[in-house]
């Protein structure tokens, strides 16, 4: 009986998973919200080239990641996990930083928020395609409304699109790259661990990023100011490493599609930081748009919290009963098993509870 009761207890799991995922996701978004304004500062006035900012910050983060992996003696990823880590590295270590760094030499932080506001919707779509998560209809309504509100107020704040320009194409590419990396990284975080996922992605891309950093310095010597170096330090330590620890942990707790919608708040925070650090105007219409985006993001997340699914019982997604999978043995025990037993057969032979308790 002791073995039975201890195996069937599930303390705090549903509450922890449904609340912890969005909380970690919000922490990651708060860290990322400074990335665009600080990148704009680093590439301003030619103090650092966009190639150096994008590649060298990955080198800084790789040093932290490699140290953490060595100190904790993490096992190496296996087989196809390396390929999936390549997707993460291509998206958030190389693709997003490079594309946004070059775009921000030609446009403002406020204008960049126009396209980056599409990232949550892109992540949600790729998460649904990549996994078997099926959000309720209310989630999609809230997500779509939030995306429209985010793009609408960001376009108005940034002065709108004067046709499709080169910086916009770079930012669209950055959104696609980051969304693919977020979706794949969220799944890998369930297998490798949240901080291990971004750490191995950084290590995998380190040789390429180091070469690009050297090329960037040779092509354009560094003449950065102290403020630019401070901004670069944040990009390397927080935006490239610590922020992903929180973000991938949130995606691992999941569900991924709902947690991704917390990013709808990021353009609001980004424009706030742009107003504070870069002197960009923050109007009443921007404040009202920010409230609309936050309300929609909260509504999307609450659709998950209000109706827990089997995935909520496992913080890292283990034990989820997927479509077409075989139910656990305990579901077919008892009366169901006795119906198929021969008359007079002993009942205890059809009770698999002790075996299933070990699972």
Spans of features found by a protein language model:
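Juxtamembrane helix-entry segments on the extracytoplasmic side of multipass membrane proteins
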Residues: 17-22, 46-55, 77-83, 155-177, ...
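Transmembrane alpha-helices of multi-pass small-molecule transport proteins
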Residues: 2-7, 45-95, 122-126, 176-184, ...
């Amino acid at each position: 009986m002791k073995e039975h009761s201890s195996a069937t207890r599930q303390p705090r799991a549903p509450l922890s998973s449904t609340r912890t995922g969005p909380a970690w996701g919000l922490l990651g978004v708060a860290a990322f919200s400074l990335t665009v304004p600080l990148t704009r500062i680093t590439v301003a006035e030619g103090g650092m080239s966009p190639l150096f900012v994008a590649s060298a910050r990955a080198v800084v983060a790789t040093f932290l990641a490699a140290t953490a992996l060595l100190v904790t003696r993490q096992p190496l990823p296996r087989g196809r996990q390396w390929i999936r880590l390549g997707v993460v590295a291509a998206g958030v270590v190389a693709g997003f930083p490079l594309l946004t760094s070059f775009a921000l030499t030609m446009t403002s932080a406020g204008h960049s928020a126009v396209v980056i506001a599409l990232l949550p919707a892109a992540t949600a779509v790729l998460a649904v395609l990549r996994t078997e998560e099926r959000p309720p209809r209310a989630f999609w309504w809230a997500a779509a409304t939030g995306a429209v509100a985010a793009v609408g107020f960001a376009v108005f704040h940034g002065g709108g699109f004067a046709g499709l320009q080169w910086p916009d194409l770079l930012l669209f590419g950055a959104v696609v790259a980051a969304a693919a990396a977020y979706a794949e990284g969220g799944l890998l975080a369930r297998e490798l661990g949240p901080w291990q996922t971004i750490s191995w992605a950084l290590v995998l891309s380190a040789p390429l990023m180091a070469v690009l950093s050297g090329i960037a310095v040779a092509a354009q010597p560094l003449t950065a100011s102290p403020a630019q170096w401070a901004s670069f330090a944040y990009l390397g330590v927080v935006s490239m490493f610590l922020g992903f620890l929180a973000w991938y942990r949130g995606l691992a707790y999941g569900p991924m599609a709902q947690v991704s919608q917390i990013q709808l708040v990021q353009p609001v925070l980004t424009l706030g930081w742009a107003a504070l650090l870069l002197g960009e105007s923050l109007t009443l219409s921007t404040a009202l748009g920010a409230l609309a985006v936050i309300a929609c993001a909260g509504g999307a997340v609450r659709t998950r919290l209000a109706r827990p699914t089997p995935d909520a019982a496992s913080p890292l997604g283990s034990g989820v009963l997927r479509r077409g999978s075989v139910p656990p043995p305990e579901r077919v025990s008892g009366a169901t098993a006795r119906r198929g037993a021969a008359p007079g057969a002993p009942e205890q032979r059809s009770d698999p509870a002790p075996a299933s308790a070990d699972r």
